[in-house]
Amino acid sequence: VAAVYRTIPYEIRGFKDLGLPPVIASICDKPRGLVLVTGPTGSGKSTTLAAMLDKINSERHEHMLTVEDPIEYLHQHKKCVVNQREVHADTHSFSNALRAALREDPDVVLIGEMRDLETIESALRIAETGHLTFATLHTNSAAQTINRIVDVFPAHQQSQVRAQLSLVLEGIMCQSLLPKADGSGRVCAKRTVVRPSSSGVSDSTRVLDRATMPRGTRSVSCHGVL
C-alpha cells in the first residue's frame, strides 16, 4: 500500500500572506470571463485559486460552484453561497458536473482542472454565457496555455476556439515555486497576462497561430517575474 499526503490548512491564506500582486485582485472583480491559473504539479495553483475565491466570497453576494478532484480547500459561506462538488464522490466526472452546472444558476465557477476536450468546451461555454470561470492547466507560459487549449480541438474547429478565447479570456497566471537563496523555503514566482481596458488579449488570441503566439502575447499587459 502506498499513499501521498499533502497538508492543507483549514484557514485560507490571504493575498498579503501569499504575496499576490494587485493585478490578481483586480481579476477577482471581473463579473464574467475565463481566468486560468497554470503551472507544474505542486506549484501552488490550488492555494492561489483558494485566495481568489475567498476574496470574492468575502466581497460579493453571489453563488459560487466548484468542481474539484479532490476538494482541497473548504470554503465557508461568507457573502457567497458556496457549493463544492468532488469528482467521484458527488459527480462521475468534470464534464458531467459542468453540463449540470448552469442549471444551478452559478455566478462563479471553479473547474479544478481542464483535462480533456469536453471539459475545455464546457469551460468556454460557461464563460461565454456570462459566468466568471476559473480553471487550471499544467502549462508554463501564456502562449503555451493558449496553444494547449487550441490544440485539443480538431483542426477545423481551431479558428473558432481562438475566436471564443478572444471574447472570454480575462487573464492567465503562470506560476512556479522556486527555492529561496538562503535555503529557508520556497517562494512563488508568477507572471500574469491580463486583458487591458482595450482589446489586447482579444486581438492577440484571435489572429495568432502557433508560430507567432509568443511574440503576440507580449502586446498584452504582463506582470511578474516568471
Task: Give the positions of each predicted feature.
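Short, flexible helix-loop junctions that flank or precede catalytic/ligand sites
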Residues: 1-206, 210, 220, 225-226
